Amino acid sequence: MNEAILKTTDASAILCDASIAAQVGDDWFDPAHWQAGLVAGGRGSAWRVQTPAGAAVLRHYRRGGALARLLGDRYWWQRAELTRPFAEFRLLQRLQALRLPVPEPLAARYRRVGVFYRADLLTRLIADAETLAQRIAGRRVDAATMQRVGATVARFHAARVWHADLNAHNVLLVDVPERASLAVRDEATTRVHLIDFDRSELRAPAGDWPEQNLARLRRSLLKLGAAADGEYEFDTTLWQPLRAGYSAARQQIDTDAAAAAGPPP
């Protein structure tokens, strides 16, 4: 991960990876500049773009909930480090340093508009990915995939990461061929990534926030029709495997941490 570089103008500021600092400018945050295609999933507006730094996703921040109608894409200005894109950029940098499966942050920008600001974030595209929501809609999710989703969420929780909007649209799945030694054919495994860390943060390990996070994910799955064949079927074939993967991963992480710490003095 390269050092982040801050570039400022009269009304805006850009925080970017040092490797692209000489190239990135305000035009990088204009979808029309890239003739971009809309990307499904997550909050706000997102476009798939091809930049000199490679394929990326450009996201324009938009409010949700009751304030969306009143303020749209405007946020109250306080100071630069508290802006949505700068906070998310820094968090993604930290999560990448922890080797967690998140998009690589490329550049973040805010633009001052009176007492408000508007914001954008550019992250590297995770190629060949589908959202968990898309898999649910196509009824293409099995127990093994849900176990991997649970195990991945467990890694974030063990690292004290609270995801502000953990839902099926913000879980990306990538099928990767995995060749077993001496095997005649390839078998596919699924890699799981989490995206959209707007308002997310590192929290103290104590508390019930991990269970609240999981409950939010469960509600999103039910809202998407994952229990179309009945909630018992959903629990048995999808949710229980997710919980099993989560529990097994947490236990393994705790065991590894205890072994690394060594015996008590």
Question: Each PLM stretch: what is its role?
Answer:
Residues 91-101, 132-169:
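Conserved kinase catalytic-core helix
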Residues 170-195:
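Conserved protein kinase catalytic/activation segment
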Residues 23-130, 154, 158:
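Conserved ATP-binding subdomain of kinase catalytic cores across diverse folds
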Residues 1-36:
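Juxta-kinase regulatory segment immediately upstream of eukaryotic protein kinase catalytic domains
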Residues 87, 148, 216:
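Charged catalytic carboxylate motif
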Residues 186-265:
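C-lobe/activation-segment region of protein kinase-like
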Residues 113-115, 183-184, 206:
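Short glycine-biased active-site loop of nucleotidyltransferases that positions the nucleotide triphosphate
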Residues 117-124, 162, 169, 190-193:
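Conserved active-site beta-strand-loop modules that form the wall/rim of enzyme catalytic pockets
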